[in-house]
Amino acid sequence: MGNASLDIDHYQHIYTEYAPMLMRFAEKFVSGFFAEDIVHDVFLKLWDKQVFRLPESDLKRVLYVSVRNACLDYLRRMNME
């Protein structure tokens, strides 16, 4: 149980630290509401895959690449409609 609590605390720390930067990054691709939604989705996937356990430098790269790819996927879907 203690380990799960540490995981949640670490995840919350990562979210607090990176989410604002990632939302600004996503807004270069999509509007604010969609940027926020995309960043939240990326963090949910991060939790599911336990990616937050990566070293900080790798984690930052994974987060930015994941957000970029999610934005591009969203734009492709919107373009197809």
Pin down the residues of each PLM region.
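Short, charged helix-capping/linker segments at alpha-helix termini
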Residues: 2-12, 23-41, 51-57
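Short hydrophobic/aromatic segments of transmembrane alpha-helices and their interfaces
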Residues: 4-5, 18-19, 45
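Amphipathic, non-transmembrane alpha-helical scaffold segments
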Residues: 15-19, 64
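Short alpha-helical functional segments enriched in proximate histidine and acidic residues
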Residues: 25, 45, 70, 74
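Structural recognition of an alpha-helix C-terminal capping motif at a helix-to-coil junction
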Residues: 37-44, 48, 57-69
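Arg/Lys-rich amphipathic alpha helix in sigma70-family domain 2
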Residues: 65-81
